[in-house]
């Protein structure tokens, strides 16, 4: 029994009471953190699902247009049209701290602001379906980046939730109950010692009176 190994002194009792107060405050703070993490995690999961559907729809649309364009163009003409892109995308990775979790944030910029620069070819020898494929992919770029952010954020927040849950459980089921048990044990021992001392004092007083 762990409590029998505790030194039953008032100093130890004071220390344990402080430890219990700290653990109780920490338990509440960690529970609040866990609950807020769960709330934000669920928001991210919902956003992630919506983004995934949107991105997959955009990719499907691009694939359909590309297949149609490929069927109506020679392979050489298609390869030539896509060989030298005019536009370029520059990506910067940053991070923001959310509830002690470093969440990735992506920023991008294009080489030029001209929307037509996504087309690396002239329109004389290509089909409108190829234009549609290129436009679909260009349009979903922001959502693809945001999807990457939310995917990683969900992974990181899930790990933090699990870590916080273990700490809450350790406080709730081990540290706090053990501190309370030890406080109860020391209090009982101190009361026993006090009663024994009072009894001993009365006996000594009686002996003195008789003599």
Feature locations, PLM:
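Charge-rich amphipathic alpha-helical interaction elements
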Residues: 1-202
